[in-house]
């Protein structure tokens, strides 16, 4: 059968918080089967847990943030969550000693490396997939996102940036999900922003940790990072990375096709909520045989980077 996965060992790293600019320690811990993905703030007493759940996402202004009724939050979870999806991790405790996950280099790649360092432990319980049974669509002005039935996990994502540095033929990406494909084609794509927006936000005491080390920065005409892009379609690829992280907030791999036009964290989350709220739109499924799986996850000892 296709089994649930956790980590073999505890791993730790430190990085900078995108919004605070302060040092953040991130600890990833193995968890028992059927625990799910739990984000935990350890710097508050008692510690506060946020189970991966689309209803926990209450702020999507500059990132995906989990917020509880008392206003305790963990921001910028989407890149780590995408890495968990990419590596097929079902059960994990994610601990941070700050209100945000460290931004690292602005991509999911450092988190993939961290998960590979920890190693993957197979658990003797079937992995539970969410299978999309009928189309569900969510619109916001000219932006939209939808799920349709498909025997696999496919992303068809289009952005629309009228900018000299963003080629018009590099604004759409079709990606058939697999662990290998995620690591090689998606995980290294960095977040991006405009210098004028970053300067304004920093004047408001936001994105204080934002820098050329963790984002692609643009002015009105060009990319300001000396090293340029990691690949030509890095912008739309990062939007796919974000969507993979946002959609994995249900805590389970999805079998279906996600199509989107100009979607972002808020719309991704609203679509996920709409799907789960409609009992006829989806069903649980497990796979007795590895061969029958429509989604290919990495072998536990596979080096993908």
Curated annotation (Swiss-Prot):
**Disulfide links within the chain:** none
The domain of life for this entry's organism is Bacteria
Catalytic positions are: 265 (proton donor)
Q: Name one GO cellular component term.
A: membrane
The GO biological-process annotations, alphabetized, read as:
lipid A biosynthetic process
Coiled-coil spans are none
Family, as annotated: Belongs to the LpxC family.
Q: What is this protein called?
A: UDP-3-O-acyl-N-acetylglucosamine deacetylase
The scientific name of the source species is Vibrio parahaemolyticus serotype O3:K6 (strain RIMD 2210633)
């Amino acid at each position: 059968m296709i089994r649930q996965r956790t980590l073999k060992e505890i791993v730790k790293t430190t990085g900078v918080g995108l919004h605070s600019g302060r040092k953040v320690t991130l600890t990833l811990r193995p968890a028992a089967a059927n625990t799910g993905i739990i984000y935990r703030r350890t710097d508050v007493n008692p510690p506060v847990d946020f189970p991966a759940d689309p209803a926990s996402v209450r702020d999507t202004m500059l990132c995906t943030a989990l917020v509880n009724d008392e206003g305790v939050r963990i921001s910028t979870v989407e890149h780590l969550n995408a890495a968990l999806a990419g590596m097929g991790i079902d059960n994990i405790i994610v601990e941070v000693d700050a209100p945000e996950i460290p931004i690292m280099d602005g991509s999911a790649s450092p988190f993939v490396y961290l998960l590979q360092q920890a190693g993957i432990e197979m658990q003797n319980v079937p992995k539970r997939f969410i299978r999309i049974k009928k189309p569900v669509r969510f619109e916001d002005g000219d932006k939209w996102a939808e799920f349709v039935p498909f025997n696999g996990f496919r992303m068809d994502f289009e952005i629309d940036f009228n900018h000299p540095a963003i080629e018009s033929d590099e604004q759409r990406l079709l990606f058939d999900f697999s662990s290998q494909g995620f690591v090689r084609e998606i995980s290294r794509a960095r977040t991006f922003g405009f210098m004028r927006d970053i300067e304004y936000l920093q004047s408001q005491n936001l994105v204080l940790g934002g820098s050329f080390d963790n984002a692609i920065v643009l002015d009105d005409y060009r990319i300001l990072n000396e090293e340029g892009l990691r690949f030509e379609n890095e912008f739309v690829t990062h939007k796919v990375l974000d969507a993979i992280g946002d959609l994995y907030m249900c805590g389970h791999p999805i079998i279906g096709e996600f199509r989107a036009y100009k979607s972002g964290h808020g719309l991704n989350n609203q679509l996920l909520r709409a799907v789960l709220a409609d009992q006829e739109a989806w069903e649980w499924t497990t796979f007795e045989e590895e061969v029958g799986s429509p989604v290919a996850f990495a072998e536990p000892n596979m080096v993908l980077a």
